[in-house]
């Protein structure tokens, strides 16, 4: 059971509500389109009406007035477990970390990842760079969330994770105040994952970190890292069975696999929900000397404005891809990051992989440009999904990133963000 939030919160009622429920979103997951506008079919994801959901969790979303000019969508979400949970979270690497990030990190450390009961999220106000008052507001949100389920006084303080997203530099008004900025190192992205599997608290942090490295830390929309990024996992063990306590156990490996695959699915949905996005693009770097180098190249291409605008314009400008590949390994002018050359131009190949299963369109082979069929290239770029393959021909490692294009709508959304 998951709730993801970008610039605005997307809420799905999966079990039963703990607060008022907004009927307009029943069964539908809303993506980045203004509430008053028609939502494109590609931006709608339907939640199944049947299935197996984790036991012992309550989830709800409601409107509380954080966004006074937009009363048509919820601005507060609440996920609670009926019993105390093991929990873990990964947070933004931005130096200006928001009050909810600081409060939640300290709470998890104080409780040693055990005894957590809920996650409370608001949209409309990031509560970032708000000083001492903002910290007090985040702590009040924790206290109010705890009060909803009569949390016992165990001397360890609050037991709720708090998340906020919205405008930076604005204070929250108690509990009721408070998908751009997406780039690795937990970048604005908020996510909650709930499981009823019995996982020892000490194991959850590494399980989540491993999953996030291959998912949320492998996506980029605009290259900006938010002050508020947080992904949390709660495990209440209600499903029963023997608790997973060993990293070498088969159950640990099985849970890691499922958690990672699930996180990848969620991360891809975040990219598809990119502000103004019209394309979902996979950047795959293969035959690299090192995984670190491959990730660096994929990341650089994924956040290149020239590559992203070319994709929006349906322009098979492979020179921009090659340019981003070439400068990806530069940390200081003229200095390679690694001693082993990651990129040998004479061995590098670039292709478009169509989403319809048709043969790849080779753009560059071993450093030599191909005679590109521009008509076929345009046909490939008409599709929403596209893979860009960069084969370095110099090793066995690979890396994958997911990104989207830059459109006119992206500029409009972010140009009018506060107005």
Curated annotation (Swiss-Prot):
InterPro entries xref list: Arg_biosynth_ArgJ (IPR002813), ArgJ-like_dom_sf (IPR016117), ArgJ_beta_C (IPR042195)
GO biological process terms on file: L-arginine biosynthetic process; ornithine biosynthetic process
Post-translational modification: The alpha and beta chains are autoproteolytically processed from a single precursor protein within the mitochondrion.
Highest taxon listed in the record's lineage: Eukaryota
Annotated compartments: Mitochondrion matrix
GO cellular component: mitochondrial matrix
Major subcellular location class: mitochondrion
Site note Involved in the stabilization of negative charge on the oxyanion by the formation of the oxyanion hole, residues: 165-166
EC number in record: 2.3.1.35, 2.3.1.1
CDD domains found in the cross-reference section: OAT
UniProt binding sites for substrate: 177, 188, 275, 414, 419
One Pfam short name: ArgJ
Reactions that this protein is recorded to catalyse: N(2)-acetyl-L-ornithine + L-glutamate = N-acetyl-L-glutamate + L-ornithine; L-glutamate + acetyl-CoA = N-acetyl-L-glutamate + CoA + H(+)
Coiled coil start-end: none
GO terms of molecular function: glutamate N-acetyltransferase activity; L-glutamate N-acetyltransferase activity
Pathway of action: Amino-acid biosynthesis; L-arginine biosynthesis; L-ornithine and N-acetyl-L-glutamate from L-glutamate and N(2)-acetyl-L-ornithine (cyclic): step 1/1; Amino-acid biosynthesis; L-arginine biosynthesis; N(2)-acetyl-L-ornithine from L-glutamate: step 1/4
Residues with site note (Cleavage): 187-188
UniProt-annotated catalytic positions: 188 (nucleophile)
Keywords: Acyltransferase, Amino-acid biosynthesis, Arginine biosynthesis, Autocatalytic cleavage, Mitochondrion, Multifunctional enzyme, Transferase
PANTHER family: ARGININE BIOSYNTHESIS BIFUNCTIONAL PROTEIN ARGJ (PTHR23100), ARGININE BIOSYNTHESIS BIFUNCTIONAL PROTEIN ARGJ, MITOCHONDRIAL (PTHR23100:SF0)
Function according to Swiss-Prot or TrEMBL: Catalyzes two activities which are involved in the cyclic version of arginine biosynthesis: the synthesis of acetylglutamate from glutamate and acetyl-CoA, and of ornithine by transacetylation between acetylornithine and glutamate.
Extra facts: This protein may be expected to contain an N-terminal transit peptide but none has been predicted.
Subunit comment: Heterodimer of an alpha and a beta chain.
Family to which this protein belongs: Belongs to the ArgJ family.
Protein name: Arginine biosynthesis bifunctional protein ArgJ 1, mitochondrial
Organism (species): Sclerotinia sclerotiorum (strain ATCC 18683 / 1980 / Ss-1)
């Amino acid at each position: 059971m998951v709730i993801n939030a970008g610039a605005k919160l997307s809420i799905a009622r999966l079990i039963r509500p703990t607060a008022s429920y907004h009927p307009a979103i029943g069964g539908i997951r809303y993506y980045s389109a203004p509430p008053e506008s028609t939502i494109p079919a590609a931006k709608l994801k339907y939640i199944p009406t049947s299935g197996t959901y984790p036991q012992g969790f309550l989830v709800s979303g409601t409107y509380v007035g954080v966004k006074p000019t937009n009363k048509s969508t919820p601005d507060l979400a609440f996920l609670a477990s009926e019993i105390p949970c093991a929990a873990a979270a990964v947070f933004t690497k931005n130096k200006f970390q928001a009050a909810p990030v600081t409060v939640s990190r300290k709470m998890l450390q104080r409780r040693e990842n055990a005894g957590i009961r809920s996650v409370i999220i608001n949209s409309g106000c990031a509560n970032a760079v708000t000083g001492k008052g903002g910290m007090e507001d985040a702590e009040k949100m924790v206290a109010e969330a705890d009060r909803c389920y009569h949390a016992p006084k165990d001397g360890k303080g609050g037991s709720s994770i708090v998340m906020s997203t919205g405008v930076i530099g604005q204070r929250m008004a108690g509990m009721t105040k408070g998908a751009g900025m997406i780039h690795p190192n937990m970048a604005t992205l908020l996510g909650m994952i709930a499981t009823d599997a019995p996982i020892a608290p000490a194991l959850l942090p590494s399980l989540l970190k491993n999953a996030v490295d291959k998912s949320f830390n492998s996506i980029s929309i605009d290259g900006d890292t938010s002050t508020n990024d947080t992904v949390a996992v709660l495990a209440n063990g209600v499903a029963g069975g023997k608790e997973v306590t060993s990293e070498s156990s088969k159950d640990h490996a099985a849970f890691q696999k499922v958690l990672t695959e699930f996180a990848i699915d969620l991360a891809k949905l975040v990219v598809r929900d990119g502000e103004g996005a019209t394309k979902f693009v996979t950047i795959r770097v293969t035959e690299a000397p090192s995984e670190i180098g491959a990730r660096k190249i994929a990341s650089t291409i994924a956040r290149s404005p020239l590559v992203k605008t070319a994709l929006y314009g349906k322009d098979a400008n492979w020179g921009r891809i090659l340019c981003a590949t070439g400068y990806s390994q530069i940390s200081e002018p003229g200095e390679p990051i690694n001693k082993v050359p990651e990129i040998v131009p004479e061995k590098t190949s670039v292709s478009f992989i169509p989403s319809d299963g048709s043969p790849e369109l080779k753009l560059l082979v071993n450093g030599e440009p191909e005679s590109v069929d521009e008509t076929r290239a345009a046909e490939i770029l008409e599709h929403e999904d596209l893979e860009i393959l960069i084969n370095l021909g110099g090793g066995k490692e690979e890396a994958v990133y997911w990104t989207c294009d830059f459109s006119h709508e992206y500029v409009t959304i972010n140009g009018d963000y506060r107005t």
